């Protein structure tokens, strides 16, 4: 989303060392820099909590100022951080990812890291594209139709960049709440997405590091 297109402007950026836990000086300077109605904190864990507390100490809080985050916020339990209530952050669709997470936990007995689902989608995408002629590969990969994977809708742009539909989550006392659902398809090409979540057995990609029986159970609940 372009801040220019949305008639927004960036008024201040703060930098700090990853080892730093004292944000008093930086936050004080930022708080007095200019009028603003939103603050983005691209961090997580104790640094996020400490920084939010320092903003509140300087009277920077909701409803006058909205806190914005990144997907890194999802790695921190913020249900007790009242200062961050109503704050929002983007995340890949949990409704799509639930299937992958449940199957992974059932098979391997542990919670998958977020990057695992992206790797899974990448392998499935490679499997789908392997049926294409070499001369048509680029067009198939960067086509406007896009794909639907275990993380929801995505497409690869001709520039080499990628677009991924995201949902917006709001911090509440009961945990993250979905306030804006992720698009499940490309609105410009509503009938053209290739769903790569469900591929016939004979077209499955090869898996390494896990036995075939584990993979089959994971995918097909055998």
Language model features with spans:
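Extracytosolic ligand-binding ectodomains
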Residues: 1-222
């Amino acid at each position: 989303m372009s801040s220019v297109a949305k008639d927004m402007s960036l008024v201040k950026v703060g930098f700090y060392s990853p080892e730093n836990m004292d944000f008093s000086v930086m936050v004080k300077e930022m708080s007095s820099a200019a009028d603003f109605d939103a603050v983005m904190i691209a961090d997580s864990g104790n640094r996020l909590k400490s920084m939010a507390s320092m903003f509140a100490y300087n009277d920077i809080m909701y409803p006058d100022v909205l806190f914005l985050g990144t997907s890194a916020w999802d790695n921190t339990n913020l249900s007790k951080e009242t200062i961050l209530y109503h704050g929002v952050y983007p995340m890949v669709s949990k409704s799509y990812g639930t299937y992958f997470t449940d199957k992974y936990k059932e098979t391997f007995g542990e919670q998958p890291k977020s990057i695992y689902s992206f790797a899974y989608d990448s392998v499935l995408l490679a499997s789908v594209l392997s049926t294409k002629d070499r001369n048509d590969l680029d067009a198939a990969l960067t086509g406007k139709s896009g794909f639907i994977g275990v993380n929801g809708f995505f497409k690869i742009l001709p520039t080499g960049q990628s677009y991924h539909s995201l949902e917006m989550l709001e911090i509440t006392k009961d945990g993250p709440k979905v306030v804006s659902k992720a698009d499940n398809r490309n609105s410009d090409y509503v009938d053209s997405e290739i769903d790569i979540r469900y591929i016939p057995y004979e077209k499955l990609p090869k898996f390494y590091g896990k036995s075939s029986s584990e993979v089959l159970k994971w995918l097909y609940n055998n």
